[in-house]
């Protein structure tokens, strides 16, 4: 059994909430998080539990449906949610009459990640939801980037800058740094974090380079 961390639970809860501050989400503040993805995924679980640590209400959908997401958003005056691009596509596919039926003005953060989001899809979501659509790039192993809607308008397609204590390198096939605009493999470093793939030390070693790891992107 993994030992409990040697830290007071109240202190740990406050630290957990700091992650949401990367997206401008603040403690208390009548926050309401709508969970529309499976809680077994690290990101989904983190956004939900960290919201609880910040004193927010969390609304959990038993099964995600695009119109039901809109209905619950209006009913509970949801302030932030976390979705993936496929769900954006399904929301945008709703008839205009359905989309205009619900008040989404309570939202301050609609956060998305987990997969590439086409620029056209992102623009349409920003036109519909307003300047609340935040994007991040990350991995369950730790570390990543974030970009607010204001910066995305200037650099469409970007996933932003590294989080605090997170570093990013783009390396070529020879494990050398790529020049700007060159295609390479993403390597991430998050503080002093270390891990090993279960039962596969060889794969783990291939994923690491000078303290940075890659998931193959």
Language-model segments: residues:
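Adenylate-forming
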Residues: 2-3, 14-23, 33, 70-72, ...
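Gly/Ser/Thr-rich phosphate-binding loop
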Residues: 53-56, 78-83, 92-155, 167, ...
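Conserved AMP-binding/adenylation subdomain of ANL enzymes
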Residues: 2-35, 40-80, 94
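Short Gly/Pro-enriched turn/cap motifs at secondary-structure boundaries
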Residues: 157-162, 207-211
């Amino acid at each position: 059994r993994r030992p409990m961390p040697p830290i007071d639970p109240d202190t740990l809860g406050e630290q957990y909430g700091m992650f949401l501050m990367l997206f401008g989400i603040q403690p208390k503040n009548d926050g309401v998080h709508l969970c529309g993805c499976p809680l077994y995924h690290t990101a989904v679980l983190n956004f939900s539990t960290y919201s609880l640590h910040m004193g927010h209400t969390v609304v959990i959908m038993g099964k995600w449906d695009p119109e039901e997401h809109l209905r619950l958003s209006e009913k509970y005056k949801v302030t932030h949610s976390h979705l993936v691009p496929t769900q954006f596509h399904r929301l945008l596919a709703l008839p205009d009459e359905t989309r205009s039926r619900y008040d989404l003005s309570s939202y301050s953060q609609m956060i998305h990640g987990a997969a590439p989001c086409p620029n056209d899809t992102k623009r349409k979501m920003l036109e519909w939801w307003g300047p609340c659509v935040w994007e991040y790039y990350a991995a369950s192993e730790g570390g990543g980037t974030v970009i607010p809607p204001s910066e995305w308008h200037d650099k469409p397609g970007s996933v932003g800058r590294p989080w605090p204590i997170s570093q990013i390198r783009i390396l070529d096939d020879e494990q050398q740094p790529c020049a700007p605009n060159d295609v390479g493999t993403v390597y991430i470093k998050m503080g002093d974090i270390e891990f090993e793939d279960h039962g596969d030390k060889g794969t783990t070693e291939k994923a690491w380079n000078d303290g940075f790891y890659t998931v193959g992107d």
